[in-house]
A protein has these predicted regions:
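Acidic, surface-exposed loops and disordered segments
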Residues: 1-186
Length: 186
């Protein structure tokens, strides 16, 4: 099997990480892969904030948990009631992906970059988990203050995040795939 397809098929959402931080060479390679993602009209209106500071990661997770408690979605509230709940699964690295609020198609561009991050990580035997609930970090009156503290450019909005770390668990088995989702017009 082709190596690229093998990596795609092996990648899983990992939710248990070793405490050891990802090496600089590896995180730089992963982030370079993100920048090689396609973007509409090659506009590249994305920004990647790589958070590895343990105190900042704890602060982010705690803020998200508190904001989830105010959610109208019962499942989110139930998870957040657990004081040990960490939306990032205690990963030692989290990438926040943001994009220019005025640019077009950035959700798609950032989605492609997110997949590149996940696939590059898997190719290096590093676990990843794409996490949308990190958006609750910016669901408070302190959103602008948090963005500034994280170095997120003004006028950029949260799109998605990716937790990264050395796997402390084997990849889960492949879940069944719905095969009735493709039609060919020839």
């Amino acid at each position: 099997m082709n190596e690229t397809i093998k990596v795609i098929k092996n990648r899983r959402s990992i939710r248990k990480y070793k405490a050891e931080q990802i090496g600089d060479t590896e995180i730089h390679a992963i982030m370079e892969a993100a920048m090689y993602a396609p973007s509409a009209m090659n506009q590249q209106k994305w920004h990647f904030t790589v958070v590895q500071n343990p105190k900042m990661l704890d602060k982010m997770a705690d803020t998200i948990r508190k904001n989830l408690l105010k959610s109208s979605i019962d499942l989110f509230v139930e998870r957040a009631k657990n004081p040990d709940y960490n939306v990032f699964f205690n990963a030692p690295t989290v990438v926040l992906i943001t994009a220019d609020e005025k640019a077009h198609f950035t959700e798609f561009d950032c989605g492609a970059a997110t997949e590149n991050i996940a696939l590059a990580a898997e190719s290096l035997n590093i676990g990843s988990c794409v996490i949308g609930m990190a958006g609750f970090l910016f669901e408070s009156e302190k959103a602008d203050e948090i963005k500034k503290e994280l170095g997120i450019p003004e006028g950029y909005k949260f799109i998605i995040s990716v937790a990264l770390g050395y796997k402390d668990v084997k990849n889960p088995p492949v879940p069944p795939k719905n095969k009735d989702v493709i039609n060919y017009v020839r």
